């Protein structure tokens, strides 16, 4: 692993109904970036907010020589789609994602940049003394464990979006066109060198969590279907096992019928019904998993855009990063649209 030269750092922050926390977020994020030895830009993506968040972002980006970039989506597409929109607009050699709720302090940004300079493709974070309810913490631990087993990447907190990505990883993710994306897992599928560092975690001061129970369930299905095809393989294995047990059970019923007569067969009627219900339940579970994959393929075949950007406002053009080749991976700058 070689040191990674950095010329520009981009901070990508998805925003959804966060007008109360935005002034402090902008102030603290800019103050943290001023500690860097590199050029920087702060890309804030409004994900169809219904409050004044979009107006606040436009005002911040309209100031002369402002480091802020406002990306306004025409409606709510979800956190990960909004981050991907920010990836398309950012120019940094290292890109850091950060939530707008200030539960992860922006003051951690210099630490992530320092780790990325060592040559890591992805720098993850682990929330210390997590300030969430038990109903959020324990399911998160189970999901993180399942992701580790499925991906083989030893990262322990996939739910924390405070992360740093090398430019080549960003370009690789942008080349993927699937509609449903979970960015930490997608990034790790392209990363060669990954690491994690502990970060602080604070209580949310303004507003409520944007993840309702139904959205958490949808996220769980996205995790299952985006990271592995193991459920499909497991479905086949379980199907063969159930078929084998069914054959053995039928053989046992025939033997008992021949050995003990018709009276015994009648006594086993309810057992047969119970087994039938178990098999039927297994079929429905399998069809449900298969339906998740078919729905994903249907969305990809439609080839709808992941998001639609209504406008992009920049205080000044970001310094374009030159092409860099490290460990055989080449990073190229993308084109930019500057609106005033």
From Swiss-Prot:
The keyword Glycosyltransferase applies. The chain crosses the membrane at residues 235-255, 269-289. Pfam families: Glycos_transf_2. It is found in: Cell inner membrane. One of its GO terms (cellular component) is plasma membrane. Its EC number is 2.4.2.53. Pathway: Glycolipid biosynthesis; 4-amino-4-deoxy-alpha-L-arabinose undecaprenyl phosphate biosynthesis; 4-amino-4-deoxy-alpha-L-arabinose undecaprenyl phosphate from UDP-4-deoxy-4-formamido-beta-L-arabinose and undecaprenyl phosphate: step 1/2; Bacterial outer membrane biogenesis; lipopolysaccharide biosynthesis. It is a multi-pass membrane protein. It catalyses: UDP-4-deoxy-4-formamido-beta-L-arabinose + di-trans,octa-cis-undecaprenyl phosphate = 4-deoxy-4-formamido-alpha-L-arabinopyranosyl di-trans,octa-cis-undecaprenyl phosphate + UDP. The keyword Signal does not apply. Keywords: Antibiotic resistance, Cell inner membrane, Cell membrane, Glycosyltransferase, Lipid A biosynthesis, Lipid biosynthesis, Lipid metabolism, Lipopolysaccharide biosynthesis, Membrane, Transferase, Transmembrane, Transmembrane helix. It is an enzyme of class 2 (transferase). SUPFAM superfamilies: Nucleotide-diphospho-sugar transferases. One of its GO terms (biological process) is response to antibiotic. GO terms for molecular function: phosphotransferase activity, for other substituted phosphate groups; undecaprenyl-phosphate 4-deoxy-4-formamido-L-arabinose transferase activity. Its main location: membrane. Catalyzes the transfer of 4-deoxy-4-formamido-L-arabinose from UDP to undecaprenyl phosphate. The modified arabinose is attached to lipid A and is required for resistance to polymyxin and cationic antimicrobial peptides. Belongs to the glycosyltransferase 2 family. This is Undecaprenyl-phosphate 4-deoxy-4-formamido-L-arabinose transferase. It comes from Pseudomonas fluorescens (strain Pf0-1). The lineage of its organism: Bacteria, Pseudomonadati, Pseudomonadota, Gammaproteobacteria, Pseudomonadales.
């Amino acid at each position: 692993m070689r040191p990674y030269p950095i010329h520009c750092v981009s901070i990508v922050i998805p925003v959804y109904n966060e007008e109360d926390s935005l002034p402090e977020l902008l102030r603290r994020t800019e103050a943290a970036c001023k500690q860097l030895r590199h050029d920087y830009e702060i890309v804030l993506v409004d994900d169809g907010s219904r409050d004044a968040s979009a107006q606040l972002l436009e005002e911040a980006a309209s100031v002369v020589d402002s480091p802020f970039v406002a990306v306004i989506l025409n409606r709510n597409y979800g956190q990960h789609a909004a981050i991907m929109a920010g990836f398309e607009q950012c120019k940094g050699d290292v890109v850091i994602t950060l939530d707008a709720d200030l539960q992860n302090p922006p003051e951690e940004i210099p630490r992530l940049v320092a780790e990325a300079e060592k040559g890591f493709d992805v720098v993850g974070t682990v929330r210390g003394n997590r300030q969430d309810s038990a109903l959020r913490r324990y399911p998160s631990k189970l999901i993180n464990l399942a992701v580790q087993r499925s991906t083989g990447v030893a990262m322990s907190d996939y739910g924390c979006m405070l992360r740093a990505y090398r430019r080549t990883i960003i370009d690789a993710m942008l080349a993927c066109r699937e509609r449903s994306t979970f960015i930490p897992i997608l990034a790790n599928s392209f990363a060669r060198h990954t690491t994690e560092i502990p970060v602080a975690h604070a209580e949310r001061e303004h507003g409520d969590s944007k993840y309702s129970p139904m959205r958490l369930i949808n996220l769980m299905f996205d995790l299952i279907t985006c990271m592995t095809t193991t459920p499909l393989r497991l479905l086949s294995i379980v199907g063969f096992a159930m078929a084998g047990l069914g054959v053995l059970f039928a053989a046992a019923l025939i033997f008992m019928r021949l050995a003990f007569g018709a009276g015994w067969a009648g006594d086993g009627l309810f057992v047969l019904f119970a087994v039938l219900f178990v098999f039927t339940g297994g079929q429905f579970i399998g069809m449900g998993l298969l339906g998740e994959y078919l729905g994903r393929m249907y969305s990809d075949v439609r080839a709808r855009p992941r998001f639609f950007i209504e406008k992009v406002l920049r205080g000044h053009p970001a310094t374009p990063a030159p092409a860099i080749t490290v460990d055989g991976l080449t990073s190229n700058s993308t084109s930019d649209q500057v609106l005033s």
